[in-house]
Amino acid sequence: MDLKQYITIVPDFPKPGILFKDITTLMDNGEAYKYATDQIVEYAREKQIDIVVGPEARGFIIGCPVAYALGVGFAPVRKEGKLPREVVRVEYGLEYGTDVLTMHKDAIKPGQRVLITDDLLATGGTMRATIDLVEQLGGVVAGLAFLIELTELGGRKKLEGYDILTLMQF
């Protein structure tokens, strides 16, 4: 299935000059959403995943159905102040400043094989920070899965050494 036909390109969003890749039109189509999810599930099975991790919010949209299909848990990664119990945290650089991501301290057990999911691989900053959280907890990052990769932004380079699945490239 050509998943690109289900992605809507929105010019000048969120700011002028950006061509936003809207995944909601893929999600609106049950057949396309199922196909995309099934592709990631197949990849995850090959990696013998114990748990799926995803950063808010679109990483949840991708990761939760994958975890369900695999019969494994899902651990959310959230911005600081959003998780109610003790967390590990990582600060990471943005284009203008820094941000912080957190994860419950007991979300990953040492040695667990982890699949990290997100909708989009752009610069790789959010994914790199998510990897750092998983590894702080002793998890083994067995794979990274994205719906879309924006190749011109070079995020894959920031993630060298990790196995990456992208379903579409723009």
Swiss-Prot record:
GO terms for cellular component: cytoplasm. The keyword Glycosyltransferase applies. It holds the Pfam family Pribosyltran. GO terms for molecular function: adenine binding; adenine phosphoribosyltransferase activity; AMP binding. Homodimer. Keywords: Cytoplasm, Glycosyltransferase, Purine salvage, Transferase. InterPro entries: Ade_phspho_trans, PRibTrfase_dom, PRTase-like, UPRTase/APRTase. One of its GO terms (biological process) is AMP salvage. Pathway: Purine metabolism; AMP biosynthesis via salvage pathway; AMP from adenine: step 1/1. It catalyses: AMP + diphosphate = 5-phospho-alpha-D-ribose 1-diphosphate + adenine. This is Adenine phosphoribosyltransferase. The keyword Transferase applies. Belongs to the purine/pyrimidine phosphoribosyltransferase family. Catalyzes a salvage reaction resulting in the formation of AMP, that is energically less costly than de novo synthesis. It is found in: Cytoplasm. The gene is apt. It is an enzyme of class 2 (transferase). Its EC number is 2.4.2.7.
